[in-house]
Amino acid sequence: MNETEKRFEEFIENYLISEKGGWTKATDAGYCSDESKDMFLDIVTLTDFVKSTHPMAWKRFERMCTINPVRQFYKAFENAVTQDGLISVLRHGFKHRGINFRVCYFKPESELNEVSITNYQKNVCQCIRQWHYSKRNTNTVDMMLAVNGIPVVAIELKNQLTGQSVDDAMRQWQYDRNPNEPAFGFNKRVLAYFACDLYNVYMTTQLKGPETTFLPFNQGSAGAGKDGGAGNPKSTDGSYVTSYFWEKVLQKDSLLDILQKFINYERTERKETLPDGSTKKTISSKVVFPRYHQLDVVRQLVNHVRTNGAGHNYLIQHSAGSGKSNSIAWTAYRMASLHNENNDAIFNSVIIITDRRILDQQLQATVSSFDHTLGSVVTIDEKKNSGALRDAINDGKRIIVTTLQKFPVIYNEVESAVGKHYAVIVDEAHSSQTGQSALKLKAALADVSDALAEYAELEEKAIEEVEANDILVQEMLSQGKHSNMSFFAFTATPKGKTLEIFGEPQPDGSFHPFHIYSMRQAIEEGFILDVLANYTTYKMCYQIAKNVQDNPEVPTSKAVRTIRRYEELHPHNLQQKAAIIVETFREVTKKKIGGRGKMMVVTASRLAAVRYYHEIKRYLESNNYDDVEIMIAFSGSLKDPDDPTGTEYTESGMNVDRNGNRVKESQTKAVFHEEGNILIVAEKYQTGFDEPLLHTMIVDKELRDVKAVQTLSRVNRIYPGKEDTYILDFVNPIERIREAFQQFYQETSLDEEINFDLIYTTQKTLRGFGIYTDEDIEEVSSIYFDPDVRKANLTQGKISNALKPVADKYNELNQERRYQFRREVRALVKWYNYISQITRMFDKELHKEYVFCSYLAKLLPSDPVQPFDLDNRVKLEYYRLEKTYEGAIELESKPGSWKPTQPKRAGGQKDRTSPLDEIIQRINEEFYGEFTDADRVMVDTLYQKMRKDSKAKKAAKTEDRQVYERSLFPGIFDTTAQEAYMENTAAYEQLFLDADKYQAVMRALADRLYKELHDDK
C-alpha cells in the first residue's frame, strides 16, 4: 500500500477508535480463527456479547446443548439470518429452543431505561483494517466495521494524491470482489459497501459484479440540506472534504442508529400478464441504506423536535428522485417513536396526508420492520368512511394515513385535543392546504388552550369568562398555528402560499425551506434525467380565412378561443401531428431503453385525445404499421360533437389488451407498462404517474409554472439502459418552459409575507355592491352558530332561505356586475381561508362575513355561457408545422423566489366585440408562417366542385360514416381531383406528386362535406 493512501486510512481509523468515534481497534484474527472457520464472522466476540447480556439464557442454552454449544448457537443464528435476513436479526434477535437471543442492543429513546443503556454500552464495535474476507484468496478490504463480531460495513479507500480515485474503488468492488463470497452475502453479512476518496463517497448495498450500481453518498456542493448541486463543499474545519462520512455516518452511535432506524429490507412483488393470459409473478428485493440527504433531513427534524417540542412547521423541498417516500416513512416512524427526557411520547399520533397508495404500502412495510411495538399503520382510504379516521385519532393510533378531504366530515367528532400533540406530514404540499379542508383538520386536532388565553387577553376577560364553547369563538381559536401541532410538508415545487404556511421565517421577512435537495442536485447526481436536455418545439403556422360575405361583430375572446380550437381540432392539423408522433415513436422512442421506450401524448382536452387516438390509428393502418400499440386515458365519457348520434367514448371502452380484452380504467397503468407504446392523455396521469420506461413526451397543450414542471417530469425517472429523454412540444415556447423550471431548479423562497389587511380591501369592495347588509350577515350567523339548529340538521335549509333576498338583489345586476360580485365573494372566502392558516385574526365581524360569503358563493349561479360557433364562418387556408427549436433548454444555477400573492381584482366579464376580419387577422399574425404554393391546403376549388356533385351528395346521405369516408368518397374525390388537374395542371400537380398531401386533402374534404351534405335537404 502506498504511504499516502495508508496515511488516509490511518487518519480515518484514528478518528473511529477515538473517544468521539466510539469504535475499538481490532484485527481480523477472530474472523480467521479455527473457532470461526467457515462462519464469516467472529463467533467468539458474538458469543461473548451474548453471554454478557443474557447470562442466564446462555447457561440455559448450554444445558440444552452440551456438545459444542458455540457451534449450535452459530447454526441457529445462521438459520435465522437465512430466513429473516441480517437486518431483522440485528433489530429483533432470534428465538431458538424457546430462548430469545439478541445479537445487538440499540440506544433507547429515553435515558431512564438503565438496563437498556447498559446493554447498549456492552456492544462490541470493532474497526478492522485490511480485512481478509475470503478463505479462497489473500485479498483484503481496506476497512471493515463489525458489530459484536458481525461484519456490517466494508470500505475501499482511494487517494487522488496516489493517482487513484473513488472510481477505482468502485471498480475494485465490481471486478475484484466476488459477490458470491459468503462475507458479501446479501442481507446476511455486510449490509453496505462504500467507496471513498478525498472528495467523494459512493455506496451500494449489494455486490453484483460488473452490474453493481453505486449511488452518490455526498452532501451536495453547498452542504447537506443546502441549495446546490452534486459533490461536497470544502470542509469548514480544514479537515478532509469527506470527513463527514466517518464523523457523521460511521461514528459508532450514528451507525448503530442507522442500523436500528434507517436501513431497511424491501421486498416487492409484481404480476405480469403473459400473451397466453397466464400470470407471471416476479419478486425482487433490495436493502435500502439512506442517502445522505435523507439521513440528514430526518436527523435535523428529530433534533429540532426533540429540542423544541411540538408546534413548529417544516417545509422540505426535495426534488423528484430524492426518495421522498422513504424520507416520509422514516420521518413518520421517528416522530411516532420520539420521546422527551421524561420518557413521554412527544406526539400522540402521526397523521400523513397523501393521495398515494404506494406510500401506504411502503409505510406499512417500513414501520413494521423497525418497531413492532408501534402497531400497524392505519390507512383510511376510499374504502373506509370518515368515521374510521375519527376512531383512529380518538384511539391514539400511532401512524394514520388519510386524505385531507375526510376531515370536514369528522372534525367536530374528534375528542378534545387538550394535552395531545400531533405530527402532520403532508405529502406533496400545495395550495390545497389553504382550503376549508385544511382548516377543519386544525379544528379537529388543535389544542386551543394558548389561543384561548390570547383571546381572553384581547377581550380583557379572565379565561373562565370566555365562552369557549361558543361555536364562533371555537372556529376563531382553531385558526393559525398551534403549539400542539407540527406540520412536515414535503414538496418539490413549493408555491408562495406553501412557503408562507410551512416555510422558515427569516429576519429579513422572507420564507425559506427547512431542508433542500434540489432538482439540480438530483440531475447532477443521476437520480433523475434532465427532461430539458433534448427539447424540440414546433410552431403551428396557419392562416384562417373568413368564409362569409359580411363582417359580423363577434365577442373577441370567445372568437379567438373558438378559432384556435377550430385550428387545433382541424383534421389537417391532427393528421400532420399524428404523422410526426408516430414517426417520432418509430425513429426515436422505440429504439430507446433496449427497445422498450414508451411515449406519452399530452392533449388539451378529452375531445382532442379521442380524435388523436383515431387519427393515429388511421395513420398506422394506412402505413401498414403493426408494431405500435396505442392507449388512451381520460375521465368520464364524451361524444364527438361532429357526430352527436355516434359512439359515446370512455377510457375502458377504447383500450384493449393484446388478447382483445377490454382494459378496465384501474388496469390502464399496468397494461400500458406491459404492452402499450403510446399513451394519449387528457388531464390524467400528468402528475403521480410513475412509469420509468416513459422516454418521450409529445405536448399539445399549454403548460405553465408548476403544471409544466409536474407534467414534463413524468419522463425523468431513471431505469437501466435509459440514458436520455425527449420532449416534442407543439404549443409552448422554450422561454415559458425555462421560466417554469427555473423557479424550482434550486431553492425556492418567498420574498416577504402577505399583507393581511388586504382582505379588508376585498371586504370594502364587496360592500360597495350594496347586495347585502350587516343584518343579512347577522341573520345567517345566528343560524350557522346555533348548536340546536346544527343538531337538528337544519342549517343548510335555513341559511339558503335567509339568503334568498340577497340572491334576488344579485340577480337584478347586469351580467358584468354579477360576474364582478361573484369574483369578490370567492376572493374573500379564499383569502380568509389562507390567512387563517397563518394567523388568528380574532375579528368576529370578519369571521361572520366569511361564513356568510362561504354559503353565498355556493348559492350564486354563474351566468350561462352562450354557445359560440364560428365553424361555418371561417376556413383553414394555409397550414404548416414549423420546427422552431431543437436542443437543450439551459437553466441558470440560481435560486427561484416568489412575490407575495395579491388578491385578484374582479375585472368585467362582458366581452368586447370585434369584426370577424380583425380577429382572423390577429390570429394569422401570430401563427402565419412562410408559405409557398405547395403548402396551401387545396380545398376551395375541389370543395366547390364536389358540393355540387350529385354523387357526392348521395354518398353523404349514408348513415355509416366509415363506409362513406373509406369506400364511397375516395372514388368521387379522385375523379374530381383529376378533372381539376386537367383544367389547371400547374396548380394541382403537387397534389398528385405528394401522396401524404393527397390523403390529407381527401380526408379533410370528406369530413367537411359529410357534415354539410349529410343533413342537407
PLM-predicted stretches and their roles:
Residues 497-596, 613:
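Interdomain helical connector at the RecA1-RecA2 junction of SF1/SF2 helicase-like NTPases
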Residues 2-349, 358, 362-373, 421, ...:
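ATP-dependent helicase/translocase motor core
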Residues 390, 396-428, 432-444, 450, ...:
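Conserved RecA-like ASCE ATPase "motif II neighborhood" in helicase/translocase motors
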